[in-house]
A protein has these predicted regions:
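N-terminal helical cap/lid subdomain that shapes the substrate entry/recognition surface
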Residues: 1-87, 91-96
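Conserved G/P- and acidic residue-centered "switch" motifs that form tight phosphate/ATP-binding loops
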Residues: 5, 9, 104, 162
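Acidic donor-binding loop at a coil-to-helix junction in glycosyltransferase catalytic cores
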Residues: 17, 161-162
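Short, acidic loop-to-helix structural element flanking the phosphoryl-transfer center
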Residues: 75-102, 108-112, 137-140, 144
C-alpha cells in the first residue's frame, strides 16, 4: 500500500504555513526564527499551538491561536498547486491498481479544500488525519494504526513524505 503525505509532497503548500506564521508573529511584533519554524513545522495543530503559546509567551489561548491560523490560511488552500509529476504518478498507480491512502498533519478543512479543488481525492481510498487521532506523524503508532486500518502489514507499505 502506498501512503502519501499531502503538504509539500502532493501539493505545493509549505509556504502557506510559513506565510501564516510570519503574519501571526508580525502581528505581535515577534520575529520568525528557525527555532520557531522547527517547533511548529510538520506537527499537528494543537501541539503547534501549545508550542507557540509557550515559545512566544503569549496570553492567547491555544484555541484562539488555532482560530487565527485558520483565518489566515483559509483562502490559501484554494490556490495551491499540484507538485510536478504528482498527477501522472497517481494516475499510473491507479492504472496499476495500487492501493493508496492519504495520511496528513494538515487541518481537515484545508486538506479537503485543496484535494477537491485539484481533483486528487479520486486516487485515494481515504484520508487519515493525524490531528483527529492526536498523534504526530513522527510517532510510529500512527503508521502502525494506519496499516492496521487498511488490513496490511506495515512492512508492505511505502511512504511518500517530505518531512520524515
Amino acid at each position: 500500500m502506498y501512503l502519501f503525505d499531502m503538504d509539500g509532497t502532493l501539493i505545493d503548500s509549505n509556504d502557506v504555513w510559513k506565510d501564516v506564521d510570519r503574519e501571526f508573529l508580525a502581528r505581535r511584533g515577534l520575529p520568525y526564527t528557525k527555532a520557531y519554524y522547527e517547533g511548529v513545522a510538520h506537527t499537528i495543530f494543537p501541539l503547534a499551538a501549545k508550542f507557540t503559546k509557550e515559545f512566544c509567551n503569549l496570553p492567547d489561548s491555544e484555541e484562539d491561536i488555532m482560530a487565527e491560523w485558520m483565518e489566515l490560511a483559509k483562502d490559501a488552500y484554494a490556490h495551491v498547486t499540484v507538485k510536478p509529476g504528482v498527477r501522472a504518478f497517481l494516475k499510473q498507480c491507479k492504472a496499476e491498481n495500487r492501493r493508496m491512502a492519504l495520511v496528513t498533519s494538515s487541518v481537515p478543512v484545508h486538506c479537503r479544500t485543496a484535494m477537491e479543488k485539484l481533483g486528487l481525492m479520486k486516487y485515494f481510498e481515504s484520508v487519515t488525519f493525524a490531528q483527529e487521532l492526536g498523534i504526530e506523524k513522527k510517532d510510529k503508532r500512527l503508521w502502525l494504526g494506519v496499516a492496521e486500518r487498511y488490513g496490511v502489514e506495515p512492512e508492505t507499505c511505502t511512504l511518500f513524505d517530505d518531512s520524515l
